[in-house]
Protein backbone atom coordinates (compact mmCIF):
# COMPACT_ATOMS: atom_id res chain seq x y z
CA UNK A 1 0.00 0.00 0.00
CA UNK A 2 1.44 3.37 -1.01
CA UNK A 3 1.66 6.34 1.41
CA UNK A 4 -1.05 8.10 -0.59
CA UNK A 5 -3.32 5.06 -0.32
CA UNK A 6 -2.73 4.88 3.43
CA UNK A 7 -3.68 8.56 3.73
CA UNK A 8 -6.78 7.93 1.63
CA UNK A 9 -7.83 4.92 3.71
CA UNK A 10 -7.38 6.88 6.95
CA UNK A 11 -9.48 9.80 5.66
CA UNK A 12 -12.26 7.48 4.51
CA UNK A 13 -12.38 5.77 7.92
CA UNK A 14 -11.98 8.95 10.01
CA UNK A 15 -14.71 10.77 8.09
CA UNK A 16 -16.98 7.70 7.92
CA UNK A 17 -17.52 8.33 4.23
CA UNK A 18 -19.03 4.92 3.61
CA UNK A 19 -19.60 1.60 5.31
CA UNK A 20 -18.89 -1.96 4.32
CA UNK A 21 -21.34 -3.18 1.66
CA UNK A 22 -21.74 0.35 0.29
CA UNK A 23 -22.55 0.36 -3.41
CA UNK A 24 -20.36 3.10 -4.89
CA UNK A 25 -20.66 4.83 -8.26
CA UNK A 26 -17.47 6.64 -9.32
CA UNK A 27 -17.69 9.51 -11.81
CA UNK A 28 -14.82 8.58 -14.14
CA UNK A 29 -13.63 11.17 -16.67
CA UNK A 30 -10.43 9.32 -17.50
CA UNK A 31 -8.22 12.16 -16.24
CA UNK A 32 -5.48 11.73 -13.66
CA UNK A 33 -7.75 12.68 -10.74
CA UNK A 34 -10.53 10.17 -11.34
CA UNK A 35 -8.16 7.43 -12.53
CA UNK A 36 -6.18 7.78 -9.29
CA UNK A 37 -9.36 7.51 -7.25
CA UNK A 38 -10.43 4.47 -9.27
CA UNK A 39 -7.06 2.76 -8.74
CA UNK A 40 -7.19 3.33 -4.98
CA UNK A 41 -10.77 2.14 -4.68
CA UNK A 42 -10.12 -0.93 -6.81
CA UNK A 43 -6.97 -1.85 -4.85
CA UNK A 44 -8.73 -1.32 -1.50
CA UNK A 45 -12.18 -2.66 -2.37
CA UNK A 46 -11.68 -5.83 -0.33
CA UNK A 47 -10.41 -3.86 2.68
CA UNK A 48 -13.28 -1.40 2.38
CA UNK A 49 -15.86 -4.07 1.58
CA UNK A 50 -17.45 -2.04 -1.21
CA UNK A 51 -19.12 -2.73 -4.54
CA UNK A 52 -17.85 -0.43 -7.30
CA UNK A 53 -19.34 0.87 -10.55
CA UNK A 54 -18.17 3.51 -13.05
CA UNK A 55 -20.02 6.32 -14.83
CA UNK A 56 -18.45 8.05 -17.84
CA UNK A 57 -19.69 10.94 -19.98
CA UNK A 58 -18.32 11.36 -23.49
CA UNK A 59 -18.60 15.11 -24.08
CA UNK A 60 -17.54 14.71 -27.70
CA UNK A 61 -15.45 17.89 -27.69
CA UNK A 62 -12.22 16.24 -28.83
CA UNK A 63 -11.39 13.66 -31.46
CA UNK A 64 -9.72 11.57 -28.75
CA UNK A 65 -12.95 11.32 -26.74
CA UNK A 66 -14.26 8.27 -28.59
CA UNK A 67 -10.95 6.42 -28.20
CA UNK A 68 -10.85 7.24 -24.47
CA UNK A 69 -14.38 5.88 -24.09
CA UNK A 70 -13.36 2.63 -25.80
CA UNK A 71 -10.26 2.32 -23.58
CA UNK A 72 -12.27 2.88 -20.39
CA UNK A 73 -14.86 0.32 -21.47
CA UNK A 74 -12.09 -2.23 -22.17
CA UNK A 75 -10.43 -1.54 -18.80
CA UNK A 76 -13.72 -1.97 -16.92
CA UNK A 77 -14.50 -5.20 -18.77
CA UNK A 78 -11.04 -6.59 -18.03
CA UNK A 79 -11.34 -5.76 -14.32
CA UNK A 80 -14.99 -6.89 -14.19
CA UNK A 81 -16.27 -3.52 -12.99
CA UNK A 82 -19.65 -2.31 -14.32
CA UNK A 83 -19.38 0.83 -16.46
CA UNK A 84 -22.19 3.08 -17.67
CA UNK A 85 -21.57 5.52 -20.52
CA UNK A 86 -23.62 8.36 -21.99
CA UNK A 87 -22.84 10.97 -24.63
CA UNK A 88 -23.48 14.67 -24.08
CA UNK A 89 -25.95 16.24 -26.47
CA UNK A 90 -27.04 19.84 -26.94
CA UNK A 91 -25.23 23.18 -26.83
CA UNK A 92 -22.01 22.89 -24.83
CA UNK A 93 -21.54 25.24 -21.93
CA UNK A 94 -19.93 24.41 -18.61
CA UNK A 95 -23.31 24.61 -16.89
CA UNK A 96 -25.12 22.51 -19.49
CA UNK A 97 -22.42 19.85 -19.33
CA UNK A 98 -22.49 19.79 -15.53
CA UNK A 99 -26.29 19.52 -15.45
CA UNK A 100 -26.15 16.68 -17.98
CA UNK A 101 -23.56 14.78 -15.93
CA UNK A 102 -25.42 15.00 -12.66
CA UNK A 103 -28.74 14.07 -14.26
CA UNK A 104 -27.00 10.97 -15.63
CA UNK A 105 -25.49 10.17 -12.24
CA UNK A 106 -28.84 10.62 -10.53
CA UNK A 107 -30.53 8.27 -13.00
CA UNK A 108 -27.88 5.62 -12.36
CA UNK A 109 -27.98 6.04 -8.58
CA UNK A 110 -31.72 5.43 -8.54
CA UNK A 111 -31.98 2.91 -11.36
CA UNK A 112 -29.00 0.76 -10.36
CA UNK A 113 -29.39 1.15 -6.58
CA UNK A 114 -26.10 2.90 -5.80
CA UNK A 115 -26.04 4.72 -2.48
CA UNK A 116 -22.77 6.67 -2.85
CA UNK A 117 -21.56 8.85 -5.73
CA UNK A 118 -17.85 9.70 -5.63
CA UNK A 119 -16.19 12.49 -7.61
CA UNK A 120 -12.45 13.14 -7.77
CA UNK A 121 -12.37 16.84 -6.87
CA UNK A 122 -9.08 17.59 -5.09
CA UNK A 123 -7.54 20.53 -3.24
CA UNK A 124 -6.70 22.34 -6.48
CA UNK A 125 -10.36 22.25 -7.53
CA UNK A 126 -11.38 23.67 -4.14
CA UNK A 127 -8.87 26.53 -4.44
CA UNK A 128 -10.02 27.36 -7.97
CA UNK A 129 -13.65 27.39 -6.85
CA UNK A 130 -12.97 29.70 -3.89
CA UNK A 131 -11.03 32.14 -6.09
CA UNK A 132 -13.70 32.14 -8.80
CA UNK A 133 -16.38 32.96 -6.24
CA UNK A 134 -14.27 35.60 -4.54
CA UNK A 135 -13.46 37.33 -7.82
CA UNK A 136 -17.14 37.39 -8.84
CA UNK A 137 -18.22 38.90 -5.50
CA UNK A 138 -20.01 35.95 -3.96
CA UNK A 139 -20.95 36.05 -0.23
CA UNK A 140 -18.87 34.59 2.59
CA UNK A 141 -21.01 31.45 2.74
CA UNK A 142 -19.93 30.48 -0.78
CA UNK A 143 -16.23 30.78 0.14
CA UNK A 144 -16.43 27.50 2.03
CA UNK A 145 -15.47 26.07 -1.33
CA UNK A 146 -16.57 22.54 -2.18
CA UNK A 147 -18.41 20.44 0.39
CA UNK A 148 -16.85 17.04 1.01
CA UNK A 149 -20.31 15.47 1.21
CA UNK A 150 -23.92 16.32 0.51
CA UNK A 151 -27.22 14.49 -0.05
CA UNK A 152 -27.74 13.28 -3.60
CA UNK A 153 -30.33 11.07 -5.32
CA UNK A 154 -31.45 9.45 -2.09
CA UNK A 155 -27.86 8.74 -1.06
CA UNK A 156 -24.66 10.75 -0.67
CA UNK A 157 -22.32 12.62 -3.00
CA UNK A 158 -18.83 12.40 -1.51
CA UNK A 159 -15.57 14.06 -2.58
CA UNK A 160 -12.86 12.14 -0.70
CA UNK A 161 -9.81 13.79 -2.37
CA UNK A 162 -10.25 17.38 -1.17
CA UNK A 163 -7.30 17.00 1.22
CA UNK A 164 -5.02 15.81 -1.59
CA UNK A 165 -2.94 18.05 -3.83
CA UNK A 166 -2.70 17.35 -7.55
CA UNK A 167 0.88 16.21 -6.98
CA UNK A 168 -0.24 13.45 -4.60
CA UNK A 169 -2.44 11.83 -7.23
CA UNK A 170 -0.37 8.99 -8.63
CA UNK A 171 -2.19 7.38 -11.56
CA UNK A 172 0.26 6.29 -14.25
CA UNK A 173 -2.33 5.66 -16.94
CA UNK A 174 -4.78 8.46 -17.64
CA UNK A 175 -6.04 10.66 -20.46
CA UNK A 176 -5.09 14.33 -20.55
CA UNK A 177 -7.85 16.68 -21.68
CA UNK A 178 -6.08 19.21 -23.90
CA UNK A 179 -8.91 21.74 -23.43
CA UNK A 180 -7.83 22.12 -19.79
CA UNK A 181 -4.68 23.88 -20.97
CA UNK A 182 -6.51 26.61 -22.89
CA UNK A 183 -7.68 29.97 -21.60
CA UNK A 184 -11.19 29.98 -23.03
CA UNK A 185 -12.85 29.21 -19.70
CA UNK A 186 -12.73 31.22 -16.48
CA UNK A 187 -11.61 28.21 -14.43
CA UNK A 188 -8.77 27.52 -16.84
CA UNK A 189 -7.53 31.10 -16.55
CA UNK A 190 -7.59 30.81 -12.76
CA UNK A 191 -5.73 27.49 -12.90
CA UNK A 192 -3.20 28.25 -15.62
CA UNK A 193 -2.52 31.97 -15.14
CA UNK A 194 -3.54 33.33 -11.74
CA UNK A 195 -2.63 30.53 -9.33
CA UNK A 196 0.94 30.03 -10.68
CA UNK A 197 1.61 33.76 -10.16
CA UNK A 198 0.20 33.68 -6.63
CA UNK A 199 2.33 30.65 -5.78
CA UNK A 200 5.41 32.70 -6.67
CA UNK A 201 4.47 35.00 -3.77
CA UNK A 202 3.50 32.13 -1.46
CA UNK A 203 4.46 28.56 -2.41
CA UNK A 204 1.89 27.36 0.16
CA UNK A 205 -0.87 29.46 -1.40
CA UNK A 206 -3.17 26.51 -2.16
CA UNK A 207 -2.90 25.20 1.39
CA UNK A 208 -3.56 28.71 2.71
CA UNK A 209 -6.80 28.97 0.72
CA UNK A 210 -7.80 25.49 1.83
CA UNK A 211 -7.18 26.50 5.47
CA UNK A 212 -9.19 29.70 4.96
CA UNK A 213 -12.07 27.66 3.56
CA UNK A 214 -11.95 25.47 6.66
CA UNK A 215 -11.95 28.54 8.95
CA UNK A 216 -14.99 29.93 7.16
CA UNK A 217 -16.81 26.62 7.63
CA UNK A 218 -16.14 26.77 11.37
CA UNK A 219 -17.33 30.38 11.63
CA UNK A 220 -20.49 29.55 9.73
CA UNK A 221 -21.09 26.56 12.00
CA UNK A 222 -21.32 29.02 14.92
CA UNK A 223 -23.74 31.18 12.94
CA UNK A 224 -25.80 28.14 11.97
CA UNK A 225 -26.05 27.19 15.63
CA UNK A 226 -27.55 30.61 16.35
CA UNK A 227 -29.92 30.18 13.43
CA UNK A 228 -31.12 26.85 14.84
CA UNK A 229 -32.23 28.72 17.97
CA UNK A 230 -34.66 30.86 15.97
CA UNK A 231 -38.33 30.01 15.77
CA UNK A 232 -38.73 28.39 12.35
CA UNK A 233 -42.11 26.89 11.42
CA UNK A 234 -42.65 25.36 7.96
CA UNK A 235 -39.66 27.31 6.56
CA UNK A 236 -41.04 30.53 8.05
CA UNK A 237 -38.73 32.54 10.32
CA UNK A 238 -40.08 34.41 13.34
CA UNK A 239 -39.86 38.14 12.61
CA UNK A 240 -39.71 38.95 16.33
CA UNK A 241 -36.81 36.55 16.98
CA UNK A 242 -35.01 37.80 13.88
CA UNK A 243 -35.30 41.47 14.89
CA UNK A 244 -33.95 40.66 18.37
CA UNK A 245 -30.60 39.58 16.84
CA UNK A 246 -27.69 41.93 16.17
CA UNK A 247 -27.58 43.57 12.74
CA UNK A 248 -24.50 41.51 11.90
CA UNK A 249 -26.18 38.23 12.77
CA UNK A 250 -29.35 39.26 10.92
CA UNK A 251 -27.22 39.61 7.79
CA UNK A 252 -25.96 36.04 8.01
CA UNK A 253 -29.34 34.63 9.02
CA UNK A 254 -30.93 36.12 5.92
CA UNK A 255 -28.06 34.78 3.81
CA UNK A 256 -28.67 31.31 5.23
CA UNK A 257 -32.39 31.69 4.58
CA UNK A 258 -31.80 32.37 0.88
CA UNK A 259 -29.18 29.60 0.69
CA UNK A 260 -32.12 27.19 0.97
CA UNK A 261 -33.20 28.43 -2.47
CA UNK A 262 -30.11 28.14 -4.72
CA UNK A 263 -32.22 28.98 -7.77
CA UNK A 264 -32.84 32.48 -6.42
CA UNK A 265 -30.29 35.25 -7.01
CA UNK A 266 -30.72 38.26 -4.73
CA UNK A 267 -28.70 41.38 -5.54
CA UNK A 268 -26.87 43.22 -2.76
CA UNK A 269 -29.29 46.13 -3.16
CA UNK A 270 -32.34 43.87 -2.86
CA UNK A 271 -30.79 42.01 0.08
CA UNK A 272 -30.30 45.29 1.98
CA UNK A 273 -33.85 46.34 1.12
CA UNK A 274 -35.28 43.09 2.51
CA UNK A 275 -33.26 43.45 5.72
CA UNK A 276 -34.80 46.91 6.14
CA UNK A 277 -38.31 45.61 5.41
CA UNK A 278 -38.06 42.79 7.96
CA UNK A 279 -37.06 45.29 10.65
CA UNK A 280 -40.08 47.51 9.94
CA UNK A 281 -43.44 46.85 11.67
CA UNK A 282 -45.42 46.93 8.41
CA UNK A 283 -46.47 43.80 6.55
CA UNK A 284 -44.99 43.20 3.11
CA UNK A 285 -45.94 41.10 0.08
CA UNK A 286 -44.14 41.49 -3.25
CA UNK A 287 -42.83 39.46 -6.14
CA UNK A 288 -39.16 38.58 -5.58
CA UNK A 289 -38.67 37.02 -9.00
CA UNK A 290 -40.73 35.05 -11.52
CA UNK A 291 -41.10 32.11 -9.14
CA UNK A 292 -41.45 33.49 -5.61
CA UNK A 293 -43.14 36.14 -3.50
CA UNK A 294 -41.36 37.49 -0.43
CA UNK A 295 -43.91 37.67 2.38
CA UNK A 296 -43.64 39.35 5.77
CA UNK A 297 -46.55 39.16 8.18
CA UNK A 298 -46.59 40.47 11.75
CA UNK A 299 -45.29 37.08 12.95
CA UNK A 300 -43.12 35.55 10.21
CA UNK A 301 -41.28 36.14 6.96
CA UNK A 302 -41.02 33.52 4.25
CA UNK A 303 -41.07 32.81 0.51
CA UNK A 304 -44.19 31.67 -1.27
CA UNK A 305 -44.15 29.89 -4.61
CA UNK A 306 -46.02 31.80 -7.29
CA UNK A 307 -48.85 29.68 -8.62
CA UNK A 308 -49.61 30.13 -12.30
CA UNK A 309 -53.26 30.81 -11.62
CA UNK A 310 -52.39 33.89 -9.56
CA UNK A 311 -51.68 35.82 -12.73
CA UNK A 312 -55.26 35.28 -13.91
CA UNK A 313 -56.87 34.23 -10.66
CA UNK A 314 -60.52 34.98 -11.27
CA UNK A 315 -63.44 32.83 -12.32
CA UNK A 316 -66.19 34.68 -14.22
CA UNK A 317 -69.70 33.57 -15.20
CA UNK A 318 -72.52 35.59 -16.78
CA UNK A 319 -75.40 33.62 -15.25
CA UNK A 320 -76.15 33.34 -11.55
CA UNK A 321 -74.28 30.20 -10.37
CA UNK A 322 -76.32 30.01 -7.16
CA UNK A 323 -73.04 29.78 -5.28
CA UNK A 324 -72.32 32.06 -2.32
CA UNK A 325 -68.61 32.02 -3.05
CA UNK A 326 -69.28 34.13 -6.15
CA UNK A 327 -69.55 37.90 -5.89
CA UNK A 328 -72.14 39.86 -7.90
CA UNK A 329 -70.70 42.80 -9.85
CA UNK A 330 -72.86 45.31 -11.72
CA UNK A 331 -71.29 46.96 -14.77
CA UNK A 332 -72.54 49.48 -17.36
CA UNK A 333 -73.91 47.98 -20.56
CA UNK A 334 -71.33 49.75 -22.70
CA UNK A 335 -67.60 50.07 -22.22
CA UNK A 336 -64.46 47.95 -22.36
CA UNK A 337 -63.94 45.59 -19.43
CA UNK A 338 -60.35 45.26 -18.18
CA UNK A 339 -59.18 42.83 -15.51
CA UNK A 340 -55.73 43.41 -14.07
CA UNK A 341 -53.62 43.50 -10.92
CA UNK A 342 -53.40 46.69 -8.91
CA UNK A 343 -50.96 49.44 -9.86
CA UNK A 344 -49.60 52.42 -7.90
CA UNK A 345 -52.20 55.18 -7.66
CA UNK A 346 -55.28 52.99 -8.18
CA UNK A 347 -58.34 54.34 -6.37
CA UNK A 348 -61.80 53.04 -5.47
CA UNK A 349 -64.99 55.08 -4.95
CA UNK A 350 -66.37 53.71 -1.70
CA UNK A 351 -69.03 55.18 0.60
CA UNK A 352 -69.02 58.38 -1.41
CA UNK A 353 -65.26 58.97 -1.16
CA UNK A 354 -62.35 58.22 -3.47
CA UNK A 355 -59.79 56.23 -1.57
CA UNK A 356 -56.42 54.89 -2.69
CA UNK A 357 -56.40 51.09 -2.70
CA UNK A 358 -53.42 51.01 -0.38
CA UNK A 359 -55.34 52.97 2.27
CA UNK A 360 -58.49 50.90 1.65
CA UNK A 361 -56.53 47.70 2.29
CA UNK A 362 -54.92 49.08 5.45
CA UNK A 363 -58.17 50.47 6.85
CA UNK A 364 -59.96 47.16 6.28
CA UNK A 365 -57.02 45.02 7.47
CA UNK A 366 -57.04 43.09 4.20
CA UNK A 367 -54.50 40.20 4.26
CA UNK A 368 -51.45 40.68 2.04
CA UNK A 369 -52.36 37.86 -0.33
CA UNK A 370 -55.84 39.24 -0.89
CA UNK A 371 -54.36 42.59 -1.90
CA UNK A 372 -53.19 40.87 -5.09
CA UNK A 373 -56.76 40.02 -6.13
CA UNK A 374 -57.66 41.11 -9.66
CA UNK A 375 -59.44 44.41 -10.24
CA UNK A 376 -62.35 44.89 -12.65
CA UNK A 377 -62.38 48.14 -14.64
CA UNK A 378 -64.76 49.54 -17.25
CA UNK A 379 -63.33 52.39 -19.32
CA UNK A 380 -60.51 52.83 -16.79
CA UNK A 381 -62.91 53.16 -13.82
CA UNK A 382 -62.68 50.64 -10.96
CA UNK A 383 -65.90 48.71 -10.35
CA UNK A 384 -64.76 45.84 -8.14
CA UNK A 385 -61.93 44.17 -6.28
CA UNK A 386 -62.62 40.49 -6.91
CA UNK A 387 -63.58 38.67 -3.74
CA UNK A 388 -63.39 41.81 -1.61
CA UNK A 389 -65.58 44.78 -2.51
CA UNK A 390 -67.65 46.52 -5.18
CA UNK A 391 -67.20 50.24 -5.69
CA UNK A 392 -70.06 52.74 -5.49
CA UNK A 393 -70.03 52.77 -9.31
CA UNK A 394 -71.15 49.14 -9.30
CA UNK A 395 -73.59 49.49 -6.41
CA UNK A 396 -75.38 52.41 -8.13
CA UNK A 397 -76.25 50.10 -11.04
CA UNK A 398 -77.97 47.48 -8.87
CA UNK A 399 -81.48 48.73 -9.64
CA UNK A 400 -80.68 49.87 -13.17
CA UNK A 401 -82.33 47.75 -15.85
CA UNK A 402 -79.70 48.64 -18.46
CA UNK A 403 -76.59 46.99 -17.09
CA UNK A 404 -74.36 43.94 -17.20
CA UNK A 405 -73.98 41.49 -14.32
CA UNK A 406 -70.93 39.31 -13.76
CA UNK A 407 -70.51 36.74 -11.03
CA UNK A 408 -66.88 36.47 -10.07
CA UNK A 409 -64.71 34.80 -7.48
CA UNK A 410 -60.98 34.52 -6.84
CA UNK A 411 -59.36 31.16 -7.40
CA UNK A 412 -56.69 31.41 -4.71
CA UNK A 413 -58.28 29.97 -1.62
CA UNK A 414 -60.31 30.48 1.49
CA UNK A 415 -58.09 33.15 3.00
CA UNK A 416 -59.35 35.67 0.44
CA UNK A 417 -62.97 34.72 0.97
CA UNK A 418 -62.39 35.26 4.69
CA UNK A 419 -60.92 38.69 3.92
CA UNK A 420 -64.07 39.61 2.00
CA UNK A 421 -66.19 38.86 5.06
CA UNK A 422 -64.02 41.14 7.20
CA UNK A 423 -64.14 44.12 4.81
UniProtKB/Swiss-Prot annotation:
Q: Which GO terms describe its cellular component?
A: cytoplasm
InterPro entries with a match to the protein in the record? Lysidine-tRNA-synth_C (IPR012796), Rossmann-like_a/b/a_fold (IPR014729), TilS/TtcA_N (IPR011063), tRNA_Ile_lys_synt (IPR012094), tRNA_Ile_lys_synt_N (IPR012795)
What EC number(s) are associated with this protein in UniProt? 6.3.4.19
Gene Ontology molecular function terms on file: ATP binding; tRNA(Ile)-lysidine synthase activity
GO biological process annotations for this chain's record?
Answer: tRNA modification
What this protein catalyses is: cytidine(34) in tRNA(Ile2) + L-lysine + ATP = lysidine(34) in tRNA(Ile2) + AMP + diphosphate + H(+)
Q: Which SUPFAM superfamilies does the record match to this protein?
A: Adenine nucleotide alpha hydrolases-like, PheT/TilS domain
- The enzyme class is ligase
Listed binding positions for ATP are 29-34
Q: Which UniProt keywords apply?
A: ATP-binding, Cytoplasm, Ligase, Nucleotide-binding, tRNA processing
**Compartments, as annotated in UniProt:** Cytoplasm
Record's function text: Ligates lysine onto the cytidine present at position 34 of the AUA codon-specific tRNA(Ile) that contains the anticodon CAU, in an ATP-dependent manner. Cytidine is converted to lysidine, thus changing the amino acid specificity of the tRNA from methionine to isoleucine.
User: In which family does this protein belong, per the annotation?
Assistant: Belongs to the tRNA(Ile)-lysidine synthase family.
**Domain statement:** The N-terminal region contains the highly conserved SGGXDS motif, predicted to be a P-loop motif involved in ATP binding.
The name this protein carries in UniProt is tRNA(Ile)-lysidine synthase
Amino acid sequence: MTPAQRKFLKIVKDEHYFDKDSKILLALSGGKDSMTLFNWLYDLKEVLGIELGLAHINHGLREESKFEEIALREMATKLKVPIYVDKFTGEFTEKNARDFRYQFFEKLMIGENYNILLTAHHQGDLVETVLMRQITGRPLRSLQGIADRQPFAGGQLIRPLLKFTKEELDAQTYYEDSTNQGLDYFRNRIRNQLIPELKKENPQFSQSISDLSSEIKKALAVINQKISELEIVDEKISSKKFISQTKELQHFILQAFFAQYPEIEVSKKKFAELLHIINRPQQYFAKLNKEFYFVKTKDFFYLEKIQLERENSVEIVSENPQDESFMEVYLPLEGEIEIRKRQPGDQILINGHHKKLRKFFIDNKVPLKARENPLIFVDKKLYAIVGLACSDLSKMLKNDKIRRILWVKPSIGEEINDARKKS
